Amino acid sequence: MKIGIIGAMEPEVAHLIASLENPVVSQIAGIEFTQGELNGKQVIVTRSGIGKVAAALATTLLIDKFAPDYVINTGSAGGFVDSLTIGDVVIGSEVRYHDVDVTAFGYEIGQMAQQPAAFVCDAHLVEAAKNAVAKLGEVKTVAGLICTGDSFICDPVRTAKMQADFPTMAACEMEGAAIGQVCHQFATPFVVIRSLSDNANNDSPVDFESYLVKAGHHSALMVMALIEGL
C-alpha cells in the first residue's frame, strides 16, 4: 500500500516528515516530496504550498509520479461548529468550493462547471479517520462539509455569506476541494482531515499564527493513527 499525504505549509507536514523511516526528498516544479515508511506503509509526504492552484499542481504530480493508493490532505482550518474549539478536528465527508459561482448556467453555488457539486471523501478513509480519533481520544471531532477558497476567512460579513450558502459547513480552508477535484478526475480515493487553528472570525489572524503548530501537530497525529489502521 502506498499513501500520499498533502499539507500546504511546513508546520502542517513537519511532524509527519520527522516520523518517516528512510526518508528520501525530491523536488518537482518547486514542490517538495518526501518518501519513506510510516507504520510499515510506503508514504509520500507532499508540501504543496498554499491555495487551490498549488494544491492541484501538487496533487497531480503526486498521483502521476508516485501513484498512491490513497491521498490524505492534512493541515489547519477555520472552524464553523460551535461545539469545537481550536485544536479540535474536522474530518471531511465531502469538500466544496465556497468561492465559485456559475449559477447563471444552472449549477449549484460552489459547483465548478462540468464538475460535481461536491467531491465526496472516500467512505473507508472517513471511517478509518473516525476510528483513529476514537483511538487517540485527545480531541473532539466531527465529520462534515469542508469548504475551500483562495481567501483566509476573518471577515464577519463573508463568514455570514458562507454560512448562508453552505449551512452545514463545518470548516473552511484553502486546498481541500482542489485536491478533491484532482483525485476525482484520477479516480484516486481521498480524505481531508483538518485541525482547527481559528474560528473564521475577527480574531482569526492572531489565532492562526498562535495555534498553527498545535493544529498541524494534532492533524498529523490523526493521520498517523489513520495510516496505522489501514
From Swiss-Prot:
GO terms for cellular component: cytosol. GO terms for biological process: L-methionine salvage from methylthioadenosine; L-methionine salvage from S-adenosylmethionine; nucleoside catabolic process. The active site is at 12 (proton acceptor), 198 (proton donor). It catalyses: S-adenosyl-L-homocysteine + H2O = S-(5-deoxy-D-ribos-5-yl)-L-homocysteine + adenine; S-methyl-5'-thioadenosine + H2O = 5-(methylsulfanyl)-D-ribose + adenine; 5'-deoxyadenosine + H2O = 5-deoxy-D-ribose + adenine. Substrate binds at residues 78, 153, 174-175. One of its GO terms (molecular function) is methylthioadenosine nucleosidase activity. Pathway: Amino-acid biosynthesis; L-methionine biosynthesis via salvage pathway; S-methyl-5-thio-alpha-D-ribose 1-phosphate from S-methyl-5'-thioadenosine (hydrolase route): step 1/2. InterPro entries: MTA_SAH_Nsdase, Nucleoside_phosphorylase_d, Nucleoside_phosphorylase_sf. It holds the Pfam family PNP_UDP_1. CDD domains: MTAN (cd09008). Its EC number is 3.2.2.9. Keywords: Amino-acid biosynthesis, Hydrolase, Methionine biosynthesis. Belongs to the PNP/UDP phosphorylase family. MtnN subfamily. PANTHER family: 5'-METHYLTHIOADENOSINE/S-ADENOSYLHOMOCYSTEINE NUCLEOSIDASE, 5'-METHYLTHIOADENOSINE_S-ADENOSYLHOMOCYSTEINE NUCLEOSIDASE. NCBIfam families: MTA_SAH-Nsdase, PRK05584.1. Catalyzes the irreversible cleavage of the glycosidic bond in both 5'-methylthioadenosine (MTA) and S-adenosylhomocysteine (SAH/AdoHcy) to adenine and the corresponding thioribose, 5'-methylthioribose and S-ribosylhomocysteine, respectively. Also cleaves 5'-deoxyadenosine, a toxic by-product of radical S-adenosylmethionine (SAM) enzymes, into 5-deoxyribose and adenine. This is 5'-methylthioadenosine/S-adenosylhomocysteine nucleosidase. It comes from Shewanella amazonensis (strain ATCC BAA-1098 / SB2B). The gene is mtnN.
